[in-house]
Amino acid sequence: MAYNRNIKARIGYSHYAISFSCLFVLFAAIPASAAEDFAKAREKLDASFAENLDSLAKKCDELGLKDHAAITRSWMIPRFSGRQYLFLPEAKDSVMPKTGGSDLTQKWYAKFQEHRAAQADGLFELAKNESKAGRPARAYQLLHEVLRENPDHAEARRILGYQKVGIAGWMLVGKSTPPAPGRRAHPKYGWGPGKYWRHETPHYSIATSTSAKQALELGEKMEELHALWRQAFFSFWTNQAGLEHRIGGGREALVKEPKKLDVVLFQDREEYVAALKPGESKIELTTGIYLDKEQTVFLYAGDETRIATWYHEAAHQLFQEIDRFPPEPGNKGNFWMVEGMALYMESLARHPTSG
């Protein structure tokens, strides 16, 4: 399959950037006047924010706070056309000073928080306006950006389905269990008791023969992808009415969550091939696979360069199981669309929290 290697993307710890030619088609439906109004409001908001951050950075220079000045200056994200910027909320503010920091550090952080909170409030108003104007996908993305600036923005957290959990910070509502060794032999893969781990996240059920640590890391990656997919394909899983209900204070969730998505991580490629070969004669040609008949993503550890493949296969699962496509979509036609949407998510790339 041809893949446009000119596609560029940047992702960071708290935000992701995606670029894909299809994006322009998606945005083409927005009337020019509406797009211009949003662009002007956004430009004005960002200009004020940038000015405040610049003043704070200069003050840090005067006080010899070199590291604080660098964080402040790098906070504004450079934006490039053809890229979509998506944000992953953190449980807590990643730049919060450690307890016992100097008085100057605390004063810097207080002012930094003040400017970011003002930006968050402005973004929140933009989000409400966009939703009301019939552009809920953009509103939903903006709500995530609100939490980059103010992780404790209570209304944005509520709308997006978060709850505060003690010192752990903000967490998605949904049952999660830490990785635990299997008590009985696995019914499918021959793993003995205590030789594999199960891990539940809000949206995934993970089984692996690797380790508890890798189960936890895989769960984090899958939840990140899930959050980004929901931002990129908002209309696929919910709608404007649902978002307006939440913004208006409604308690009904944006969507009734389907069953958790199954992911299996094998210890290595050899185990992956041996386990799946009986049902997939050409499995050795793959580096990860989503099998619709199993409703499961199968991956293997030991090669972190394959993370794009993980995203690709997990994206197929999201499209297939969130709204149940017909079995094996693309076999009889529109294969380009099925693969193109998975490649869209494969193009994700991380971008640092600050700058």
What are these regions (language model features)?
Residues 17-29:
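Bacterial N-terminal signal peptides
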Residues 33-43, 87-114:
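Repeat-mediated protein-protein interaction surfaces in helical alpha-solenoids
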Residues 42-43, 74, 144:
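Alpha-solenoid helical repeat scaffolds
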Residues 60, 79-81, 150:
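Alpha-helical junction/boundary sensor with strong preference for TPR arrays
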Residues 96-106, 113-118, 131-307:
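Non-catalytic architectural context of zinc metalloproteases
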Residues 294-355:
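Zinc-dependent metallopeptidase catalytic helix centered on the HExxH motif
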